[in-house]
Amino acid sequence: ILLTQSKGTILFNSMGLGYRPMGETLPRMRNGVLVAFEPGKTTTYSLNTAQERGTLFVGPGVDVYTGMIVGQNTRENDIDINVVKGMALTNMRQSFKNIRPPLTPPVEMSIEQALDFIEDDELMEIAPQSLRLRKKLLTHMDRVRQQRKQPHE
């Protein structure tokens, strides 16, 4: 967590006093995720909007598909978000009004970090060039139907 939050710029030292029996396991507390609901290539414009809602796992120009996890939400619920929408340019003078600050670099996870991150309703895809997280049920309607079928806890 420290390495992720500091974006790789932290030094950490520790000393051990000994070993003790492990107590009760802590419950997992993770915020929700940002889920792409349209397939295509991500755009800087839409990622700027998504960045306001949480931490991104993808950068601009990345191919995404429906149900792919593109970031972590700042709140506890999952949000379906459009990360492929482009900015409509109607007038050249107006296009310079909407210049936003640059994107923060996306968080790149190792296999171990991704395995620790995913929940029961999520999967991890491992390919030679990429590591992708996705929902088990890709479409939003399928996930809503599944939630209705499950008894509330």
Each language-model region and where it sits:
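Accessory interaction regions appended to the cores of large information-processing enzymes
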Residues: I1-E153
